Regions:
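Acidic, low-complexity intrinsically disordered segments
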Residues: 69-79
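Long, compositionally biased stretches
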Residues: 1-65, 85-110
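Exposed beta-sheet edge/beta-hairpin loop segments within beta-rich domains
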Residues: 79-85
């Protein structure tokens, strides 16, 4: 049975990591990872610590450990991510999976 997530709003607290000059959040809670597994490599609306942007979800399966969802954060906001990384370590992450047709997919179709 496939779970349809269109129009879904998910919230979690996730660690904020730095990898090279990029920042990322990793959704590691198994329930959330399973829900988002079918959204691998899809662009969704993401709000990290109150900062909204369009991001791509990446389903990762490491050789050791448990699968997780990785979201790279916009590089142009590195100043914000650096401050959050040093002060908080974990941030509130909201993932909004939009309904079909909200981005103009069905515009003008009768």
């Amino acid at each position: 049975m496939e779970i349809v997530l269109r129009g879904t709003h998910l919230v979690d607290i996730a660690p904020l990591w730095k990898r090279g000059d990029l920042y990322q959040v990793s959704i590691m809670r198994s329930e959330m990872v399973e829900l988002l597994r079918d959204c691998d490599n899809k662009e969704v609306m993401v709000i990290v610590a109150g900062v909204p942007f369009r991001g791509r979800l990446k389903y990762e399966t490491p050789k050791r450990g448990h699968p997780y969802i990785r979201i790279f954060l916009p590089k142009k906001l590195n100043v914000i991510w650096a401050k959050l990384h040093e002060t908080a370590g974990k941030v509130k992450v909201e993932i909004i999976i939009e309904n079909e047709g909200t981005r103009g997919d069905s515009y003008g179709k009768q």
